[in-house]
UniProtKB/Swiss-Prot annotation:
Name used for this protein in its record: Terminase, large subunit
Matches recorded under InterPro entries: Gp19-like_virus, Gp19_RNaseH-like, P-loop_NTPase, Terminase_large_su_gp19
EC numbers for this chain: 3.6.4.-, 3.1.21.-
Gene3D superfamilies (alphabetical): P-loop containing nucleotide triphosphate hydrolases
Keywords recorded for this protein, A-Z: ATP-binding, Endonuclease, Hydrolase, Magnesium, Metal-binding, Nuclease, Nucleotide-binding, Viral genome packaging, Viral release from host cell
Superkingdom: Viruses
Domain notes: The ATPase region is in the N-terminus, whereas the nuclease region is in the central part. The C-terminus is involved in prohead binding.
Transmembrane segments: none
Source lineage: Viruses, Duplodnaviria, Heunggongvirae, Uroviricota, Caudoviricetes
Binding-site residues for Mg(2+) 2, renumbered to this chain: 364, 420
Region of interest: Nuclease activity: 344-429
Length: 586
């Protein structure tokens, strides 16, 4: 054997024995930059066979899926008899990983032996490596989490981003996902070398990964985009922080606190831009990998404090009793709230009803870009504020949007249209006024907002919710969820009013999008004076005045039931009309 051949054999042996070395060679072949320190650290963790059940969490854009595909190839090179199952949220995503694995095998000449032989499986979704012995299960199989998981056994299961916004936004969706991942136990070979590896980024505060850690004995290793920014964040990470980062941080926490962990990949300027784009909560989830946000003090606006029920469009009960319990919990509506923040109807309500008193349409005009023109339709009655409709339009204040808003005003027979004048110095009102007049006669009022938006929202809405004076028409929640879409028309729960409401905090940039929420806040602020009424007291006073006025009328006999409106309250009574003498003379 020539000296060159000897050197080649030594290099190949080194690559086969060291995944980090293999990664450097592969990155070079792919014309990628040299692996960064965090990528190298991830490679070491993956190659450590002692990690049997663990969750690898790394910030968006670090390349964890690429590294894991490389790990699959390297693992099969070392032991071609292993069976690996790749599961992703969608079939397409799983297949992309499978295709990339095949491309790696085709790319590196020293991996020729891994190419499928004639007669072996050789498809995108399922293939064998050359030295693999005939077996019921393929060497590599890719499948979506909702696909056909059964029928194969695996030595290693890699769950790559099985949690995405569309399958984790509501409590019902999260429960379904949790049920699906329980199948992994039946698919994993009962061997001491078998492994389950989750790769992912938390999508919600109630992330699947937290449940796995708390209830299934998984360990979590985290590579956040920044070193811990506070003592509280450091305490949350604890032993979860990648050992390399933990050692670096402990040695120089004063200099490293809040600094980028991998400045070659993302420097501070890049990360600041992403924080503005995702909002503080989104950035903390997807770049800091910290789902520990479910704090009642931090997030004061909760769905459970509202009353959600079906509503008549003309009248409503005079008062409600709020008492959240299992009997009045609504599990059919899409719930985008935090964990434990359930949707409830009322416990009981008054038999007396009244016509709605004020009817307003509120508009938060937007400019161009990613903002929506948010709107809300609010009614009032006896100290309660009713949310009848809410939504947003993605195209600023185009003619189409103005027409749609004017039609909303007519549909709900509003008396007043309220808009925020900060945008364009009142220009929206001048543009909208003639369009509104064409469809509906209503007053047009502008409100100028002052101070930090997040503080305004929390300070305005918290008293309404904490006193249970907000009543939400049940279909508003369903429609809001279905219409939450980004500028490209893709479903994005961050545009939902109730997602924005439950993630709002008293800090700058708490949520990335707040257009629907700000419109709702504007309407509540406009109607705030109506909340000064004591619903039960007002109802009693109206009834007492009614009775006092008619106590002196003679009663002749039992008659038929009559209804009438008194001070906005609808009353029912039995009247005698035998001789033309009415018990109550209206």
């Amino acid at each position: 054997m020539s000296t060159q051949s000897n050197r080649n054999a030594l290099v190949v042996a080194q690559l086969k024995g060291d995944f980090v070395a293999f990664l450097f060679v592969l990155w070079k072949a792919l014309n990628l930059p040299v692996p960064t320190k965090c990528q190298i650290d991830m490679a070491k963790v993956l190659a450590n066979g002692d990690n049997k059940k663990f969750i690898l969490q790394a910030f968006r854009g670090i390349g964890k899926s690429f590294i894991t595909c490389a790990f699959v190839v390297w693992t099969l090179w070392r032991d071609p008899q292993l069976k690996i199952l790749i599961v992703s949220a969608s079939k397409e995503r799983a297949d992309l990983n499978s295709i990339f694995i095949k491309n790696i095998i085709d790319l590196l000449p020293f991996l020729d032996e891994l190419k499928p032989s004639p007669g072996q499986r050789d498809s995108v979704i399922s293939f064998d490596v050359g030295p693999a012995k005939p077996d019921h299960s393929p060497s590599v199989k890719s499948v979506g989490i909702t696909g056909q998981l059964t029928g194969s056994r695996a030595d290693i299961i890699i769950a790559d981003d099985v949690e995405i916004p569309s399958n984790s936004a509501t409590q019902g969706a999260r429960e379904k996902l949790w049920t699906l991942v329980q199948e992994f136990r039946a698919l994993l070979k009962p061997l001491p070398t078998s492994r389950v590896i989750y790769l992912g980024t938390p999508q919600t505060e109630m992330t699947l990964y937290k449940e796995l850690e708390d209830n299934r004995g998984y360990t979590t290793i985290i590579w956040p985009a920044l070193y811990p920014r506070s003592r509280e964040e450091d305490l949350y990470y604890g032993e979860r922080l990648a050992p390399m980062l933990r050692e670096e941080f402990n040695d120089g926490f004063e200099m490293l606190q809040g600094q980028p962990t991998d400045p070659v990949r993302f420097d501070m300027e890049d990360l600041r831009e992403r924080e503005l784009e995702y909002g503080k909560a989104g950035f903390t989830l997807q770049f800091m990998l910290n789902p520990n946000l479910s704090d009642a003090e931090k997030y004061p606006l909760r769905l459970r404090d509202a009353i959600v029920c079906g509503l008549d469009f003309e009248k409503a009960p005079m008062h409600y009793q709020w008492l959240p319990n299992r009997q009045n919990r609504n599990e059919e509506l899409p719930n985008v709230g935090l964990k434990g923040d359930d949707i409830h109807s009322y416990h009981s309500c008054s038999q007396n009803t009244g016509q709605y008193q004020q009817r307003i349409l509120v508009i938060d005009p937007s400019g161009r870009g990613k903002d929506e023109t948010g709107y809300a339709v609010l009614f009032t009655l006896n100290g309660y504020i009713y949310l009848m409709e809410a939504g947003g339009f993605p195209d600023g204040y185009s003619d189409k949007t103005l027409e749609s808003l004017a039609k909303k005003a007519n549909e709900w027979k509003v008396q007043t249209v309220v808009f925020e004048s900060n945008f364009g110095d009142g220009m929206f009102g001048k543009v909208f006024s003639p369009v509104l007049l064409k469809h509906h006669a209503a007053a047009l009022e502008e409100i100028r907002a002052r101070g930090m938006k997040e503080l305004r929202i929390c300070d305005t809405l918290e008293p309404v919710l904490s006193t249970h004076r907000l009543v939400i028409r049940d279909e508003v929640i369903r429609e809001d969820y279905q219409t939450a879409r980004d500028a490209d028309g893709k479903h994005d729960v961050r545009y939902s009013l109730f997602y924005q409401l439950t993630r709002m905090a008293r800090e700058k940039g708490a949520v990335a999008h707040d257009d629907r929420l700000d419109a709702f806040r504007l309407g509540v602020e406009f109607l705030r004076s109506t909340m000064e009424l004591d619903a039960v007291k007002v109802e009693a006073e109206v009834l007492e005045a009614f009775l006092e006025e008619h106590m002196e009328h003679p009663i002749h006999s039992a008659g038929h039931v009559v209804t009438a409106m008194v001070d906005g309250m609808e009353l029912y009574w039995e009247d005698d009309d035998v001789n033309g003498d009415r018990f109550i003379n209206w």
